[in-house]
Amino acid sequence: MRKIVVLFVVAFCLLSTGMRAQHTFVHKQSSTYEWPEDSLVLKKLDQWRDLKFGVIFHWGLYAVPGIVESWALCSEDVDWISRYGHNNYQEFKDWYWNGLSKQFNPTEFEPAQWAEVTKQAGMKYMIFTTKHHDGFCMFDSQYTDFSISRCAFKEHPKADVAKYVFEAFRKEGFMTGAYFSKPDWHNQDYWWDYFATPNRNVNYKIERHPEKWEAFKTYTHNQIGELMSNYGTIDILWLDGGWVSPRNNQDIDMPQIAAMARAKQPGLLVVDRTIHGKYENYQT
């Protein structure tokens, strides 16, 4: 059985590579690179470069219906976003946010098996999705009730899923990373239900409602602080949602986030995905 799982992982990686080649999902690489100045970050980066092969886990509410992460919540007309039988956008959002959290109950969750299988496949570092764009936390955040530890899975002894995932992989010698979505479509200070949600971006004018944006920044900083404080050694902070950036007038203060995170996790690699520069220690 273990050999079958390993073969499945390898096959999935090869299939994913083929899909990317066909649909050009690969993000453009920067022609320049800004080297970190912190000696501890440079040391960690050298260690990471030697690992060569890693795995990223996307796991969340979207696993219940088996859809493409949380992207169906986004009202954008592209081929890879489908609502699978739901014709009404608002009904879909209600079903996703209010229905799936009542169904997501992975009682056979066993992260030690994940770690064992990926180690057998030769992988040496991992990234785990602590929160995707839908805002559903796979860790026990004190700043929202929209999390795995407050929903159908809350009575399980491993309800704080991220904690046990990171522990299992550290035990097998992996470098561990926390994926975290900068946008949060469930948060009223990002997608405010006073307005429609026409696309992936914040749906109000920040210059007209600066207090809401400040509240969202605080929420984001607090949740990242939890991950950096309560989950043992974290080697990589992998930030997704590149449209949340100063170039789009969505500045969440990356200098402060990086400084806070590295104060708690010295040598931390920061990957502000697709935002080339000081806070993209490696590109994906």
What is each PLM-predicted segment?
Residues 1-24:
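Bacterial Sec-dependent N-terminal signal peptides
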Residues 22-284:
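Mature catalytic domains of secreted/periplasmic carbohydrate-active enzymes
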